[in-house]
């Protein structure tokens, strides 16, 4: 799809905030082409609007938080992943609290509601951010790189020193079908000892076995077990889709991440956006859409398929 899209109708959610433990209601509304994704804290007087963009990220501890002045909205990554995954470029997000509801810990409830609301196609072309040169950020043993590629792809190498998790690797070559079918339902996860520690410090107050995979000393303690054998790394890729959508554009490039999280994802997006020599923005015509690298991009021979 080369044209910008929004929702066909409204979609409303109500649920618990993972960290605040408070019930929050959120409504997605259609928006005009060129709007982007804009959150509105409607519980404040006057309401405060915050564009979902990397320049508005104010915190990446445990989740991704955007803010403006004293107002903020946290835990936006699952909703942002669902919007990107369903092809939604423009939407208003009315929210009556400081945190997006965690729902079941995945993007699946958001995807289902967006799918039910339908999609409206505009006549305005999308802008694709096409990576021209590699960009890398490193933090200790954590690393994230985005390199030129003919497609949008995320490859994630996850490593934990725990027998139930250990190392997991998976790649997503992005399409709406692959994201919705293979990644949207992967749930957030945490270690029991860390969850108990966070709750003692006033965090993760809404966390439960209903909205997260919890890992104890001997493995997953959720009675239903895992939705996928490698659900953990699938969820890390889901988070990455949401965090990387804060470029404000559809992406064409290959992200390679090792032990990355919200903070490093944000640093990668920020580093990319401040280096205009490393990317180009393209509005594709129908004729050019299937051959993006013929437009102002160097030789193709070294690019990944």
From Swiss-Prot:
<dbReference type="GO" id="GO:0046872">
    <property type="term" value="F:metal ion binding"/>
</dbReference>
<keyword id="KW-0862">Zinc</keyword>
<dbReference type="InterPro" id="IPR004463">
    <property type="entry name" value="UDP-acyl_GlcNac_deAcase"/>
</dbReference>
<dbReference type="InterPro" id="IPR020568">
    <property type="entry name" value="Ribosomal_Su5_D2-typ_SF"/>
</dbReference>
<feature type="active site" description="Proton donor">
    <location>
        <position position="262"/>
    </location>
</feature>
<dbReference type="InterPro" id="IPR011334">
    <property type="entry name" value="UDP-acyl_GlcNac_deAcase_C"/>
</dbReference>
<feature type="binding site">
    <location>
        <position position="78"/>
    </location>
    <ligand>
        <name>Zn(2+)</name>
    </ligand>
</feature>
<keyword id="KW-0441">Lipid A biosynthesis</keyword>
<comment type="pathway">
    <text>Glycolipid biosynthesis; lipid IV(A) biosynthesis; lipid IV(A) from (3R)-3-hydroxytetradecanoyl-[acyl-carrier-protein] and UDP-N-acetyl-alpha-D-glucosamine: step 2/6.</text>
</comment>
<keyword id="KW-0443">Lipid metabolism</keyword>
<comment type="function">
    <text>Catalyzes the hydrolysis of UDP-3-O-myristoyl-N-acetylglucosamine to form UDP-3-O-myristoylglucosamine and acetate, the committed step in lipid A biosynthesis.</text>
</comment>
<dbReference type="GO" id="GO:0103117">
    <property type="term" value="F:UDP-3-O-acyl-N-acetylglucosamine deacetylase activity"/>
</dbReference>
<protein>
    <recommendedName>
        <fullName>UDP-3-O-acyl-N-acetylglucosamine deacetylase</fullName>
        <ecNumber>3.5.1.108</ecNumber>
    </recommendedName>
</protein>
<dbReference type="GO" id="GO:0016020">
    <property type="term" value="C:membrane"/>
</dbReference>
<dbReference type="Pfam" id="PF03331">
    <property type="entry name" value="LpxC"/>
</dbReference>
<keyword id="KW-0444">Lipid biosynthesis</keyword>
<comment type="similarity">
    <text>Belongs to the LpxC family.</text>
</comment>
<dbReference type="GO" id="GO:0009245">
    <property type="term" value="P:lipid A biosynthetic process"/>
</dbReference>
<keyword id="KW-0479">Metal-binding</keyword>
<dbReference type="InterPro" id="IPR015870">
    <property type="entry name" value="UDP-acyl_N-AcGlcN_deAcase_N"/>
</dbReference>
<feature type="binding site">
    <location>
        <position position="239"/>
    </location>
    <ligand>
        <name>Zn(2+)</name>
    </ligand>
</feature>
<keyword id="KW-0378">Hydrolase</keyword>
<feature type="binding site">
    <location>
        <position position="235"/>
    </location>
    <ligand>
        <name>Zn(2+)</name>
    </ligand>
</feature>
